[in-house]
């Protein structure tokens, strides 16, 4: 009952719930982002680029480990809530609005970008992979910090998984287009309350934060 799977998008949930009668709990790595205030503090203390959510180091790994562990141990009739992150406000959603799950849970789906990724050899960090790294991380502080997180705390989190499913994008070039489509849908669903919706330029910059880890994923996670 405690098998964890990652990389499966939410489109699989109705099939599992209705067709197989499986009790499924879904948690995205996005839902354990540090709060906006915590990321701003990290950006001031370590490197300004850490204000932008997404890369290893911008998640509350302890929260993720606790949630997955509690889901595995959830007994019959017991309930717990799952954290949720509001991308339209770039902050963790109010705890009172977190969804509730009732035990026992048969399957935990832990999905999202960078799940299952591994740290790079130190020598691979020397050369910037894009303009963002060249201009805003010229001394490599940010990318070394991110890499260190992957090799330590994130490795412990990913070790909790029993299986890994990777959905292969056709190329890195497809990712900005998909991200922009998500922003359009997010703006439509959030309405006037959306304060952090990205335009084309914003998406282009945002994706550069992810490039260093995404390209090895596409090459090696198959």
Predicted regions: what they are:
Residues 2-11:
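Single conserved hydrophobic/aromatic residue that forms the stacking wall/gate
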Residues 11, 101-102, 157:
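Structural alpha-helical scaffold elements that stabilize or flank donor/cofactor-binding regions
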Residues 14-25:
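Post-Walker A helix-loop "phosphate-sensing" segment adjacent to the P-loop in P-loop NTPases
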Residues 25-28, 32-90:
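Conserved nucleotide-sensing/catalytic segment adjacent to the nucleotide-binding pocket
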Residues 77-78, 104-108, 163:
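Loop/turn-to-beta-strand initiation segments
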Residues 91-102:
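Glycine-rich phosphate/ribose-binding loops and adjacent secondary-structure elements
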Residues 108-114:
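Switch II (G3) loop of P-loop NTPases
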Residues 114-222:
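Conserved NTP phosphate-binding and transfer environment spanning the P-loop NTPase/kinase superfamily
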